[in-house]
């Protein structure tokens, strides 16, 4: 925000994009507010610059619902010539036919992911993966994780979704991750481009990939796994 007029925060759903951006914003436009959604969409099509009025940085949440806001943000950034004007959050499923400018030089892109074990305060952070790959002399002798194997398996299954850490029991935490996968299979896989896809088949494909994580597998093996389910 100190360098660019706008920042786009990209990443999977539920990873905390809107919550994080809200802590930095001084005004917020929520495109999916049910009481104002239709009004916002009409305004976005007729005069999108009106929706950009507000204290800065102004957060535009779920901006992909009105893709023309992208070019409007770029135009306002050009006019104002002041860093830190807008934060955009939302899905990657965007109708790019309504976007005419890449935003280069005006809109910076940041990738956000679910929390690491360090961020969830479950890891000591003593071992750096970056150093392991980049520094051949990196010494990790004597550094031990405080987590048991069972705890690591649970954390990997639970994931780093902020909502799961708020759940009251371990079972509830796993339900958050399970619901995330179910939502992908039943809704997101079709909403990306509007084409209806089979939720059960999608689930079987994901299961086939999950069974073969960290292995080399032929496409035929994956197909056999799916068709035999």
Task: Report residues per predicted region.
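Short glycine-rich substrate-engagement loop in P-loop NTPases that contacts/grips substrate
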Residues: 28-57
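Structural recognition of the conserved hydrophobic beta-strand(s) that form the central parallel beta-sheet
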Residues: 59-60, 85-91, 111, 120
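Conserved lysine of the Walker
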Residues: 17-18
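Post-Walker A alpha-helix
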Residues: 21-22
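Conserved catalytic/switch belt of AAA+ P-loop NTPases
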Residues: 70-94
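Short regulatory helix/loop adjacent to the ATP-binding pocket of P-loop NTPases
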Residues: 94-109, 121-126
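Interdomain hinge/linker elements that couple catalytic modules in large macromolecular machines
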Residues: 122-229
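Hydrophobic anchor at the beta1->P-loop junction of P-loop NTPases
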Residues: 9
